[in-house]
């Protein structure tokens, strides 16, 4: 049984930051490259997010990212040529769970980073806008039938630019529950940041009211740490 689910709103001092939709003037581009150590220090830690967050029991596969399109699609591989810096955390409880997967792909130059982001954008552009998945019961998984909507938004924050794939999953009425996911892919200089936040609610058929603000604040906190 899940043991710790705090309020859906994230309680962190860092969450004053947020991502814009491109209307604000971005900060000027830096002249130098961003180091892997800089990204390692910029990624949020459990203590930055809230007291109920912790590292997951299972370590993530460093060669794969989180799923971008959702549904039954497989997660894309990490675009080649980068040093991977990652940090993942979960907040689990009786009413649901939250997850945060942060991956920084640090390339040797800006051109390689742009190519890496383009590869991930190609995956996102192939996502279906509406998905219906029947109930699944296997030795490893039991999941009720659900529908999921997918949309892509443009992002521009503090000199970082890219996109976010926003997914809303809703389970069949006899198994009420939702899963709201945002996968942000942003590039600045030689770095591609893939930041995925998800909130899962049990016995609740409504989207979390704090979801839209929370994922933007989490991403904004990281990019503003880098500058």
In which residue ranges do the predicted regions lie?
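Bacterial signal peptide processing site
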Residues: 20-23
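Bacterial N-terminal signal peptides that target proteins for export
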Residues: 1-9
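Core hydrophobic alpha-helical membrane-spanning segments
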Residues: 11-13
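Short, well-structured beta-strand
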Residues: 175-202
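C-terminal motif of bacterial Sec signal peptides marking the signal peptidase cleavage site
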Residues: 15-18
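A short acidic/glycine-rich loop-to-helix N-cap element
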Residues: 197-214
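Post-signal peptide N-terminal segment of mature Sec-exported envelope proteins
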Residues: 28-50
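A small/polar (G/S/T-enriched), proline-flanked helix-loop surface module common
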Residues: 53-182, 210-226
